[in-house]
């Protein structure tokens, strides 16, 4: 009887630990200077072009010109 209770208790403890690890791993965030995305957020700062930074720099590039 004691063996059965111990086995069940151990089994329930393993299930609880696996659930805890799942929550921790799915809600983790990434520090500055690492890769980020919509589903992998930054801990602090913003996700700019796939990288965690404090602020997003303005994007410079070619602008379309209207031709008449």
Curated annotation (Swiss-Prot):
Keywords from the named record: Amidation, Cleavage on pair of basic residues, Disulfide bond, Secreted, Signal, Toxin
One Gene Ontology molecular-function label: toxin activity
Propeptide: 64-68
Pfam families, per the entry: Conotoxin_I2
Membrane-traversing stretches: none
Disulphide bridges, residue numbers: 29-43, 36-48, 42-52, 47-56
Keyword Disulfide bond part of the UniProt annotation: yes
Modified-residue entries (Phenylalanine amide), positions: 60
Tissues expressed in: Expressed by the venom duct.
Compartments it resides in: Secreted
Domain remarks: The cysteine framework is XI (C-C-CC-CC-C-C).
Protein family: Belongs to the conotoxin I2 superfamily.
Official protein name in the record: Conotoxin Em11.5
Species of origin: Conus emaciatus (False virgin cone)
Lineage: Eukaryota, Metazoa, Spiralia, Lophotrochozoa, Mollusca
């Amino acid at each position: 009887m004691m063996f059965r209770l111990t086995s069940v208790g151990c089994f329930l403890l393993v299930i609880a630990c696996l659930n805890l690890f799942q929550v921790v791993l799915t809600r983790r965030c990434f520090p500055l200077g690492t890769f980020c995305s919509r589903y992998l957020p930054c801990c602090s700062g913003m996700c700019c072009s796939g990288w965690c930074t404090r602020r997003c720099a303005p994007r410079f590039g070619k602008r379309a010109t209207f031709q008449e």
